[in-house]
């Protein structure tokens, strides 16, 4: 009711205008300071204040002519009231409260404003402004020391590769130290290895962490406390599922004793030791909480010495301890708020928004208790929320029905295939499977296990090896179109987007793509993280993994990160592929054309071989190993400071990735590689190579002796090792422990002297008498036949052909697949494709050429040519003879080119000339005028118009253009708005048809809102008919129905009314569908039947009622009085 209140001090005349809801104690404090100041200046007597301690309040309204006067005096809880009881409320003693009744006064009686300037300025300095304390809270660590049966837990401050904490953490020092921080959870297994420095005589200790501890930002500033300081206590709340920041109220400080400890008045609890006290004046840390009295009535902090930065922190940097960490530590300690601030710019057209983890909307939707959120712990923390869902649609549709039919009809084939079936199944796409796999990233990181001197030796050996194989300086790929061409356009755009990249880039110009690449690079350079999408991989998995609910997760990079990432890594990766087998990796190898044989021959004969496959490889990679890959890449990249910063920020994002999960939670991981980053295989391979060189350095095997004692090849997490037979076993025995020190889980017990027993990249080497050929297991080949993942019949045919290629080397299996293929092409819908000559025949000679890289000569393909000749003789009447010369009777005469036998071709085709038959013969009967042909045959041969463009069932382009322009003008919209309206019109017509008898309005939806548009401009401007106009939309409508069916069962109303039961024909169930020669027979029959059913018993009147023809006629009837009435005569009593 009242908008402002003016407080007036009757003793000083001072006033203060405030909101009526202002806390009265602040007002009371304001006037008390004014009175104190005047007393000290001897302008006011203390007795006057005692006699008249109260003030007055005038409540006023906007534009009102009256005010309400209220007297305010200090509350006396012992005052006896009119009712005979005391006032009470002793906790409010001396606080101003209303005394007596309020009195209405005129506005003219309200004292004029009189705020004292000097006091106002003083009031401005009472409280300081906003300050960002995230710089401090982001480096707060929680430390737990478990030694000698005792456990102590407190906090510390991360600073580079060091932690600043309390000395009393290590009353016992013979156990493990667990470190929880905003860049992960770590475990130091042996605290006696830690080097520590006490700071003066205070309770402050600096711990030097092991070298594999990722360095933290070094932005903190320290100084000694001062008497005038006000401080606040800052903490990080390490919950099991997330981390949040905490800030206390401010407190004054006071030195105790000789100043090594200071007292503060902030409430604390056990375990709060080590938390920093930060000055609100400048943000400097002045001490860390250390002591409390037994009754917790007083708290003390260890003060920072005056020379702390110069004497301690500056000397720490002199040790060059953090020199080898190349990732950007300033971008590590991000949180959900940072994700919201770093959302992709408008140029990327993101459609989803990241929201805070515990916003009001989150509480309403219950997202904070999502099925994954409940399971989070350790090194997986929830940071934000992003709308998402679990995709359970599988790319593997199910068992191949054609293969099942073949086995049912062929007992011999069934007896052969059944033992090889059932070994693979569809991966499980469930919540449990996702939780099981994603939680592999939650394991704490073990520190201090690595021998850093030996690791540097191994790293330098890898550098030397790169130089020896001729690895050259790499460039940053700044050609935007080159980046675009190397994208997988069938993949999704990202977690904050919808659809595939192909649709995203559709219609974009080169300049627009270039701007996208620049924007992505700028995001990387700025340290802005994109939100990656975590999903389950839909694939065929071995049966034991399916039964154990083990499904691999895929973490895909968003477009806003991916483009810039490819700028940084693509050139290095391309050169890395080219060096396969020259260097100890097979990334980029082609297993065909003797590729696998070359690979196997790289392993010395008679050595001891071992194949090792990493377990939980991606999730076990530590920041230390990934940082080593970054060091190696920067070593071979061109000198460009912008590119180096982009690359460093990229690998920071790869380690500390924000992942959007299916339950809507965005989690932050602190270890491991991402399977969907553009360099996963190369980076994983490099880390295995680094691990191998570290292990060899620990064995003290010099670089020069490596080739004579060990050979190895890596591909991602796959590793193949060959060691000389005398002492090689000792090398293999030591590898597992060395790999484990780096966090990698490998088993090196699968050993053999037979190369054909080795398994590498799921392939084995099969010796066929001449060479090694790569083979996958027969059960895996059969799974291609057993399971159908094709969306089109042509793709299924290609899959069976791929199975034939993979089966070469298993003669019986290949022959059985050929039998199935022969059966398959006789069944619908494959028979129609076969009839068009679109099914492939893969000959034995082609397979030999593919695997063995042998040249094909005429004698090899002679039997095939002979068989084809016999087949053609049985089908045609004409005999075609090979001649010395061939002549084109309808073309210009020219001497035949000499036939020269060409050498070194994959297939020699230059030995015989084949007669050509003209497409149109001039012997046919053609229309003529005065003896001259009226057709241009040369034009006719090339004239192949699109059927729909010349069909009279579709409006011409001119008619469609006129219709479009008139409808757009009638609706008064732009071309961009019209594009959306036509989407709605097409979908409405799919449901309601295009009958000329339509009237009224048509509707489309905008979210939950229904919008109506008049039909009149749509119909009256349609020439020749509305159905012929809508025929232009036929293909789009067909694709739209398919899209709807891919999401859920959908049958247009036109098909439902005809009781169409086959949902595979739903795409043809609309009345403006355009039939062409490409329409399948079954679909054509179904559409015509639906059309016939819709038109049954329909009558169309050629003429309506003619309103111009009159119906008047002259009445010539004559009546007499004896007639019955005016319309009836009477004849002897008979009515006529």
From Swiss-Prot:
<dbReference type="GO" id="GO:0008234">
    <property type="term" value="F:cysteine-type peptidase activity"/>
</dbReference>
<dbReference type="GO" id="GO:0000166">
    <property type="term" value="F:nucleotide binding"/>
</dbReference>
<dbReference type="InterPro" id="IPR001205">
    <property type="entry name" value="RNA-dir_pol_C"/>
</dbReference>
<dbReference type="Pfam" id="PF00863">
    <property type="entry name" value="Peptidase_C4"/>
</dbReference>
<keyword id="KW-0645">Protease</keyword>
<dbReference type="GO" id="GO:0006508">
    <property type="term" value="P:proteolysis"/>
</dbReference>
<feature type="active site" description="For nuclear inclusion protein A activity">
    <location>
        <position position="273"/>
    </location>
</feature>
<keyword id="KW-0788">Thiol protease</keyword>
<comment type="similarity">
    <text>Belongs to the potyviridae genome polyprotein family.</text>
</comment>
<keyword id="KW-0547">Nucleotide-binding</keyword>
<dbReference type="InterPro" id="IPR001730">
    <property type="entry name" value="Potyv_NIa-pro_dom"/>
</dbReference>
<dbReference type="InterPro" id="IPR043502">
    <property type="entry name" value="DNA/RNA_pol_sf"/>
</dbReference>
<keyword id="KW-0548">Nucleotidyltransferase</keyword>
<dbReference type="InterPro" id="IPR043504">
    <property type="entry name" value="Peptidase_S1_PA_chymotrypsin"/>
</dbReference>
<keyword id="KW-0696">RNA-directed RNA polymerase</keyword>
<dbReference type="GO" id="GO:0003968">
    <property type="term" value="F:RNA-directed RNA polymerase activity"/>
</dbReference>
<dbReference type="InterPro" id="IPR007094">
    <property type="entry name" value="RNA-dir_pol_PSvirus"/>
</dbReference>
<keyword id="KW-0167">Capsid protein</keyword>
<keyword id="KW-0946">Virion</keyword>
<feature type="active site" description="For nuclear inclusion protein A activity">
    <location>
        <position position="168"/>
    </location>
</feature>
<dbReference type="InterPro" id="IPR043128">
    <property type="entry name" value="Rev_trsase/Diguanyl_cyclase"/>
</dbReference>
<feature type="site" description="Cleavage; by NIa-pro">
    <location>
        <begin position="122"/>
        <end position="123"/>
    </location>
</feature>
<dbReference type="GO" id="GO:0003723">
    <property type="term" value="F:RNA binding"/>
</dbReference>
<feature type="domain" description="RdRp catalytic">
    <location>
        <begin position="607"/>
        <end position="731"/>
    </location>
</feature>
<keyword id="KW-0808">Transferase</keyword>
<feature type="domain" description="Peptidase C4">
    <location>
        <begin position="123"/>
        <end position="341"/>
    </location>
</feature>
<dbReference type="GO" id="GO:0042025">
    <property type="term" value="C:host cell nucleus"/>
</dbReference>
<dbReference type="InterPro" id="IPR001592">
    <property type="entry name" value="Poty_coat"/>
</dbReference>
<dbReference type="GO" id="GO:0039694">
    <property type="term" value="P:viral RNA genome replication"/>
</dbReference>
<keyword id="KW-0378">Hydrolase</keyword>
<protein>
    <recommendedName>
        <fullName>Genome polyprotein</fullName>
        <ecNumber>3.4.22.44</ecNumber>
        <ecNumber>2.7.7.48</ecNumber>
    </recommendedName>
</protein>
<feature type="active site" description="For nuclear inclusion protein A activity">
    <location>
        <position position="203"/>
    </location>
</feature>
<dbReference type="Pfam" id="PF00767">
    <property type="entry name" value="Poty_coat"/>
</dbReference>
<dbReference type="GO" id="GO:0006351">
    <property type="term" value="P:DNA-templated transcription"/>
</dbReference>
<keyword id="KW-1048">Host nucleus</keyword>
<keyword id="KW-0693">Viral RNA replication</keyword>
<dbReference type="InterPro" id="IPR009003">
    <property type="entry name" value="Peptidase_S1_PA"/>
</dbReference>
<feature type="site" description="Cleavage; by NIa-pro">
    <location>
        <begin position="365"/>
        <end position="366"/>
    </location>
</feature>
<feature type="site" description="Cleavage; by NIa-pro">
    <location>
        <begin position="883"/>
        <end position="884"/>
    </location>
</feature>
<dbReference type="Pfam" id="PF00680">
    <property type="entry name" value="RdRP_1"/>
</dbReference>
<dbReference type="GO" id="GO:0019028">
    <property type="term" value="C:viral capsid"/>
</dbReference>
């Amino acid at each position: 009711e009242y908008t402002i209140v003016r407080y007036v001090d009757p003793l000083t005349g001072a006033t203060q205008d405030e909101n009526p809801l202002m806390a009265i104690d602040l007002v009371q404090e304001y006037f008390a300071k004014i009175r104190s100041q005047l007393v000290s200046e001897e302008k006011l007597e203390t007795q006057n204040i005692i006699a008249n301690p109260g003030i007055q309040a005038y409540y006023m309204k906007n534009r009102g002519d009256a005010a309400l006067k209220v007297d305010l005096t200090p509350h006396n809880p012992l005052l006896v009231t009119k009712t005979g009881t005391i006032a009470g409320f002793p906790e409010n003693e001396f606080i101003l409260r209303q005394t007596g009744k309020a009195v209405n006064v005129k506005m003219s009686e309200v004292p004029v404003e009189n705020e004292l300037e000097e006091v106002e300025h003083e009031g401005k300095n009472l409280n300081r402004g906003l300050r960002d304390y995230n710089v401090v809270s982001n480096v707060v660590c929680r430390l737990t020391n478990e030694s000698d049966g005792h456990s102590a837990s407190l906090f510390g401050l991360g600073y580079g590769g060091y932690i600043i904490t309390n000395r009393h953490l290590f009353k016992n020092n013979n156990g493990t130290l667990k470190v929880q921080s905003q860049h992960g959870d770590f475990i130091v297994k042996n605290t006696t290895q830690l080097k520590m420095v006490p700071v003066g005589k205070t309770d402050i200790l600096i711990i030097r962490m092991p070298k594999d501890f990722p360095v933290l930002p070094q932005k903190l500033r320290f100084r000694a406390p001062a008497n005038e300081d006000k401080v606040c206590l800052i903490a990080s709340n390490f919950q099991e599922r997330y981390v949040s920041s905490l800030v206390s109220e401010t407190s004054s400080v006071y030195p105790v004793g000789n100043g090594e400890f200071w007292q503060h008045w902030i409430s604390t609890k056990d375990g709060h030791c080590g938390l920093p006290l930060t000055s609100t004046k400048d943000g400097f840390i002045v001490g860390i909480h250390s002591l409390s009295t037994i009754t917790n009535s007083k708290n003390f902090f260890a003060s920072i010495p005056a020379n702390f930065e110069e004497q301690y922190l500056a000397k720490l940097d002199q040790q060059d301890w953090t020199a080898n960490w190349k990732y950007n530590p300033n971008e590590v300690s991000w949180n959900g708020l940072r994700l919201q601030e770093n959302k992709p710019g408008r140029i990327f057209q993101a459609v989803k928004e990241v929201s805070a983890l515990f916003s009001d909307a989150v509480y309403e939707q219950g997202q904070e208790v999502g099925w994954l959120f409940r399971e989070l712990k350790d090194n997986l923390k929830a940071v934000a929320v992003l709308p998402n869902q679990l995709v359970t649609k599988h790319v593997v549709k199910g068992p191949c029905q054609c293969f099942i039919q073949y086995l049912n009809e062929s007992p011999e084939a069934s007896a052969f295939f059944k033992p090889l079936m059932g070994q693979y199944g569809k991966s499980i796409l469930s919540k449990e499977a996702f939780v099981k796999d994603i939680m592999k990233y939650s394991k704490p990181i073990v520190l201090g296990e690595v021998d850093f001197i030996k690791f540097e030796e191994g790293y330098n050996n890898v550098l030397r090896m790169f130089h020896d194989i001729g690895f050259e300086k790499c460039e940053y790929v700044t050609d935007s179109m080159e980046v675009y061409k190397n994208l997988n356009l069938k993949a999704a755009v990202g977690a904050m987007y919808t659809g595939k990249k192909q649709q995203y880039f559709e219609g974009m110009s080169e300049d627009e793509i270039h701007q996208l690449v620049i924007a992505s690079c700028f995001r990387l350079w700025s340290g802005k993280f994109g939100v990656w999408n975590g999903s389950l991989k839909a694939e065929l998995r071995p049966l034991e993994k399916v039964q154990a609910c083990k499904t691999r997760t895929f973490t895909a990079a968003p477009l806003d990160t991916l483009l810039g990432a490819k700028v940084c890594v693509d050139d290095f990766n391309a050169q890395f592929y080219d060096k396969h087998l020259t260097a100890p990796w097979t990334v980029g190898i082609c297993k065909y054309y003797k590729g696998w044989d070359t690979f196997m021959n790289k392993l010395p004969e008679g050595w001891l071989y071992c194949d090792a496959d990493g377990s939980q490889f991606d999730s076990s990679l530590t920041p230390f190993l990934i940082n080593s890959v970054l060091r190696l890449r920067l070593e071979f990249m061109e000198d460009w400071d912008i590119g180096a910063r982009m690359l460093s920020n990229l690998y920071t994002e790869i380690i500390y990735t924000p992942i959007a999960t299916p339950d809507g939670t965005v989690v932050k991981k602190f270890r491991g590689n991402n399977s969907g980053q553009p360099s996963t295989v190369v980076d994983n391979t490099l880390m295995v190579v680094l691990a191998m060189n570290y292990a060899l350095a620990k064995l003290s095997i010099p670089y020069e002796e490596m080739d004579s004692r060990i050979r190895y090849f890596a591909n991602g997490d796959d590793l193949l090792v060959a060691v000389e037979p005398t002492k090689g076993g000792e090398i293999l025995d030591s590898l597992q422990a060395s790999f484990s020190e780096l966090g990698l889980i490998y088993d090196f017990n699968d050993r053999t002297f037979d190369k054909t027993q080795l398994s590498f990249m799921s392939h084995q080497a099969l010796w066929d008498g001449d060479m090694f050929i790569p083979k996958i297991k027969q059960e895996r080949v059969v799974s291609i036949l057993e399971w159908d993942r094709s969306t089109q019949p042509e793709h299924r045919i290609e899959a069976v052909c791929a199975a034939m290629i993979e089966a070469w080397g298993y003669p019986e299996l290949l022959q059985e697949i050929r039998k199935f293929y022969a059966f398959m092409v006789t069944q619908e819908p494959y028979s129609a494709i076969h009839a068009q000559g679109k099914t492939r025949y893969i000959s034995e000679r082609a397979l030999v050429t593919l695997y063995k890289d042998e040249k094909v000569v005429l004698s090899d393909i002679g039997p095939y040519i002979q068989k084809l000749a016999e087949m053609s003789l049985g089908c045609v009447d004409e005999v075609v003879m090979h001649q010395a010369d061939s002549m084109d009777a309808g073309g210009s005469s020219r001497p035949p080119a000499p036939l020269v036998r060409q050498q070194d071709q994959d297939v020699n085709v230059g030995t015989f000339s084949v007669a050509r038959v003209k497409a149109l013969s001039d012997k046919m009967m053609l229309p003529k005028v005065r003896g001259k042909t009226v057709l241009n045959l040369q034009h006719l041969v090339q004239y192949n118009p699109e059927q729909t463009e010349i069909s009279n069932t579709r409006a011409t382009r001119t008619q469609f253009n006129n219709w479009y322009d008139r409808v757009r003008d009638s609706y008064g919209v732009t071309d961009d708005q019209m594009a959306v309206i036509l989407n709605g019109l097409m979908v409405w017509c799919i449901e309601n048809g295009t009958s000329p008898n339509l009237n009224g309005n048509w509707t489309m939806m905008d979210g939950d809102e229904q919008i109506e548009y008049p039909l009149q401009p749509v119909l009256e401007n349609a020439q020749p008919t509305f159905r012929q106009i809508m025929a232009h939309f036929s293909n789009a409508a067909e694709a739209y129905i398919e899209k709807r069916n891919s999401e859920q069962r959908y049958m247009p109303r036109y098909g439902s009314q005809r009781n169409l039961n086959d949902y595979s024909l739903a795409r043809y169930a609309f009345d403006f569908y355009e039939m062409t020669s490409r329409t399948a027979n079954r679909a054509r029959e179904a559409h015509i039947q639906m059309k016939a059913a819709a038109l049954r018993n329909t009558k169309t009147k050629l003429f309506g009622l003619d309103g111009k023809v009159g119906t008047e006629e002259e009445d010539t009837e004559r009546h007499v009085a004896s007639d019955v009435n005016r319309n009836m005569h009477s004849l002897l009593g008979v009515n006529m």
